[in-house]
Structures are given as structure tokens and as C-alpha cells.
């Protein structure tokens, strides 16, 4: 789904508006190997404070699930950069698995990651995704046993998303050595490409994770924080993503 060395920016759909989200997507797509577009949810338990607040802002502004597909359809008029939708299972369940995935595919999504759907309960989802031609992405944590990691790798048709830290998302100044140990372990086990996220905020971290064996690096909270405090978020976002991706692709 993406080239080795790619930066993968995460954006929350609808924060602060549908129109701004489209502007953000167009600002970063030139420098992104793939984009994660998060679907706002009222209880984003896996996310840290920064991304949680972005979900809440979008929902307070009246954001609806259909707005995600509307943003993506408009984005597809301008760009072919791969996009995966990142969601919790509740919106998928409420919509219906087949209907949700059908709308995602029709709007231009390339894949989907359901944060709180374990592989062991993903049978219907996997069948429907295969039918629609959508790539599937599953999460693995540092404490995921090797055998479980093999199961996740087998179920993933897009890439495996490695959580570099225990706990929720959020930018950190430094990543612990356990994050790099996990990447090296997963590299020996997984056949899929590996994307690493949670806690990444600086280009030095991107470089370190790629050297450890990651194929792509996800940056989310640092970008959402920039958007929330900037007076010129489109230009600052573009500059930040260009900086991070340029550093990663120079390896």
C-alpha cells in the first residue's frame, strides 16, 4: 500500500470542519506514502487526549459518518494517494459491516483499520473486506506474543500496524528501547509491511524506527496538536509533513 520509508500522516475527519479536512488532505498528500483518516467516535478509548479532543471537536460541529465518505470522494477527484480509514467498531456495526465497507470502497478508500476489532472476531469483516477489495490492517502491541503476531500478519492484507508504546496515543519526546525491540521482533515474524505509530513526533524518531526495520511511520498526535493551535494550519501542516517525510525518504 505504500513504499518503504513512507511517512503516514493521520488526520481526524471533520476536525475542525469537512472543508478544512479536505484542505489538510491535499496539503499532505504530496509527501505521504499513505494517509490515515480517522472517523470521529464518541468514545475513542485507544487514543490519547490530543486525538480524543479532535474527535470531540468534529462531533460537536455536527460531523456525521457520511461526511467521511464525502471528504474522501472529493479528495479522490484530486489525488490517488492511498487512504485507509481508521475507525472503532461501533460505527461499522451500526451501519452494517457490508454496507459500511461498500460505502468506504465506493468513496475511494483503499483499506480499513478497526481499532477495537481483534482478529479472532473479524471473520465477517474479513470476508466483506475481501469481497469489496479493501485492504485490512490490524494492530499489534509490544506485548503481543509471537504466535498472535503471526495470526495478525496472516489476517492483514494491507500492512501490520505496530503500536510502539503501551497505552494510548500521544506525542513523546523520546521512544523507549522496547519500541525498537518490538519492531525488530516483528520484522523477523511478519511478511507484511510494517507501519509504526503511537508517540512519534520528530524526524529523528522516524529515522530510528525505519532503521529498526519499519517500512512506514505514522504521525498523528503531533499533527493534530499543530492543527489545533495554529493560525495557519494548512501551511504549517504541509511544512511539518514535508520535513518529516523528506527526512525519512533520505535514508
UniProtKB/Swiss-Prot annotation:
Show the coiled coil region(s): none
Q: Which residues form the active site?
A: 36 (proton acceptor), 47 (proton acceptor)
Name a GO CC annotation attached to this entry.
cytosol
Pathway annotation from the record:
Amino-acid biosynthesis; L-tryptophan biosynthesis; L-tryptophan from chorismate: step 5/5
What processes does the entry annotate via GO biological process terms?
L-tryptophan biosynthetic process
Q: Does the keyword Lyase apply?
A: yes
The record's annotation in Gene3D superfamilies points to: Aldolase class I
> Which InterPro entries does the protein's record reference?
Aldolase_TIM, RibuloseP-bd_barrel, Trp_synthase_alpha_AS, Trp_synthase_suA
Q: Which UniProt keywords apply?
A: Amino-acid biosynthesis, Aromatic amino acid biosynthesis, Lyase, Tryptophan biosynthesis
Please indicate which superkingdom the organism of origin belongs to.
Answer: Archaea
SUPFAM superfamilies the UniProt entry points to: Ribulose-phoshate binding barrel
The EC number on file is: 4.2.1.20
One GO molecular-function annotation for this sequence? tryptophan synthase activity
**Function (record text):** The alpha subunit is responsible for the aldol cleavage of indoleglycerol phosphate to indole and glyceraldehyde 3-phosphate.
Q: Which family does it belong to?
A: Belongs to the TrpA family.
- Protein name as catalogued: Tryptophan synthase alpha chain
Amino acid at each position: 500500500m505504500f513504499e518503504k520509508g513512507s511517512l503516514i500522516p493521520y488526520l481526524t475527519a471533520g476536525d475542525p470542519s469537512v472543508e478544512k479536512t479536505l484542505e489538510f488532505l491535499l496539503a499532505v498528500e504530496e509527501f505521504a506514502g499513505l494517509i490515515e483518516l480517522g472517523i470521529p467516535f464518541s468514545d475513542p478509548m485507544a487514543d490519547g487526549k490530543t486525538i480524543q479532543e479532535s474527535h470531540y471537536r468534529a462531533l460537536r460541529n455536527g460531523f456525521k459518518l457520511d461526511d467521511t465518505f464525502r471528504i474522501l470522494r472529493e479528495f479522490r477527484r484530486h489525488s490517488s494517494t492511498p487512504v485507509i480509514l481508521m475507525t472503532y467498531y461501533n460505527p461499522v456495526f451500526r451501519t452494517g459491516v457490508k454496507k459500511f465497507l461498500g460505502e468506504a470502497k465506493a468513496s475511494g478508500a483503499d483499506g480499513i483499520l478497526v481499532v477495537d476489532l481483534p482478529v479472532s472476531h473479524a471473520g465477517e469483516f474479513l470476508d466483506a473486506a475481501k469481497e469489496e477489495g479493501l485492504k485490512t490492517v490490524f494492530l499489534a502491541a509490544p506485548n503481543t506474543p509471537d504466535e498472535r503476531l503471526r495470526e495478525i500478519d496472516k489476517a492483514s492484507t494491507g500492512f501490520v500496524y505496530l503500536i510502539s508504546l503501551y497505552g494510548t496515543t500521544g506525542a513523546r519526546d523520546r521512544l523507549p528501547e522496547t519500541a525498537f525491540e518490538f519492531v525488530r521482533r516483528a520484522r523477523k515474524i511478519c511478511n507484511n509491511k510494517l507501519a509504526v505509530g503511537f508517540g512519534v513526533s520528530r524526524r529523528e524518531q522516524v529515522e530510528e524506527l525505519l532503521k529498526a526495520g519499519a517500512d512506514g511511520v505514522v504521525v498523528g498526535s503531533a499533527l493534530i496538536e499543530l492543527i489545533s493551535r495554529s493560525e495557519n494550519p494548512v501551511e504549517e501542516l504541509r511544512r511539518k509533513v514535508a520535513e518529516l517525510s523528506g527526512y525519512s525518504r533520505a535514508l
